[in-house]
Amino acid sequence: MVKSHIGSWILVLFVAMWSDVGLCKKRPKPGGGWNTGGSRYPGQGSPGGNRYPPQGGGGWGQPHGGGWGQPHGGGWGQPHGGGWGQPHGGGWGQPHGGGGWGQGGTHSQWNKPSKPKTNMKHVAGAAAAGAVVGGLGGYMLGSAMSRPLIHFGNDYEDRYYRENMYRYPNQVYYRPVDQYSNQNNFVHDCVNITVKQHTVTTTTKGENFTETDIKMMERVVEQMCITQYQRESQAYYQRGASVILFSSPPVILLISFLIFLIVG
């Protein structure tokens, strides 16, 4: 009986000590925090003073120490102590004390340099480029190519081409190959739309093409359209082969069996 009483008292003492330690940990430390001697807000100028409410022994509405609307200690709208809108003590937008909104204090966060604005000319240019392709009735723009070296049969045209090849397109417009019955139809349509589009766009910029330019441009674009057709045909057949492979019954059964093993 005595041992049970002793054990109970030891348990009570342990719980009391544990509770006291927990309360000590939760007690605020002196010198910092909200409404204590240390300043937490960056906008304070007077040492040891806070903004909400001011220190000095007074409470809200007291004649000394700073209350709401009091002549001493610094309250809301007071001439001393540094309150909201005061000339001293460092409040919101104040010339002294530092750290207010737009002030010379070292902790101001409102004077950061503004982020650079998006260049709207670049955005508009990108949108316009997308509209050109979309406005051609389903035509796609191929990737850039190196302009082919072509011989035209005489030295004058060969030299003229080498000197002016940079004026000719290095990309072609085309539709998907499955919309054409053969390569000739694809190339014919590709050459017409590419030469027309390049001529109209370049003429709008103030540059004109001669008959020699058109002749050479058609030869250059024709070679690039043939290359584009070969690329698209190869990719099209590869996609078709993949679909046929994965749609065959043996492959479907194998995939189903593997899924069954993984899930099961």
Curated annotation (Swiss-Prot):
It is a lipid-anchor; GPI-anchor. A lipid is attached at residue 241 (GPI-anchor amidated alanine). It is found in: Cell membrane; Golgi apparatus. The keyword Repeat applies. Residues 242-264 form a propeptide. One of its GO terms (biological process) is protein homooligomerization. The normal, monomeric form has a mainly alpha-helical structure. The disease-associated, protease-resistant form forms amyloid fibrils containing a cross-beta spine, formed by a steric zipper of superposed beta-strands. Disease mutations may favor intermolecular contacts via short beta strands, and may thereby trigger oligomerization. Contains an N-terminal region composed of octamer repeats. At low copper concentrations, the sidechains of His residues from three or four repeats contribute to the binding of a single copper ion. Alternatively, a copper ion can be bound by interaction with the sidechain and backbone amide nitrogen of a single His residue. The observed copper binding stoichiometry suggests that two repeat regions cooperate to stabilize the binding of a single copper ion. At higher copper concentrations, each octamer can bind one copper ion by interactions with the His sidechain and Gly backbone atoms. Belongs to the prion family. Monomer and homodimer. Has a tendency to aggregate into amyloid fibrils containing a cross-beta spine, formed by a steric zipper of superposed beta-strands. Soluble oligomers may represent an intermediate stage on the path to fibril formation. Copper binding may promote oligomerization. Interacts with GRB2, APP, ERI3/PRNPIP and SYN1. Mislocalized cytosolically exposed PrP interacts with MGRN1; this interaction alters MGRN1 subcellular location and causes lysosomal enlargement. Interacts with KIAA1191. It is linked to Found in high quantity in the brain of humans and animals infected with degenerative neurological diseases such as kuru, Creutzfeldt-Jakob disease (CJD), Gerstmann-Straussler syndrome (GSS), scrapie, bovine spongiform encephalopathy (BSE), transmissible mink encephalopathy (TME), etc. This is Major prion protein. It comes from Antilope cervicapra.
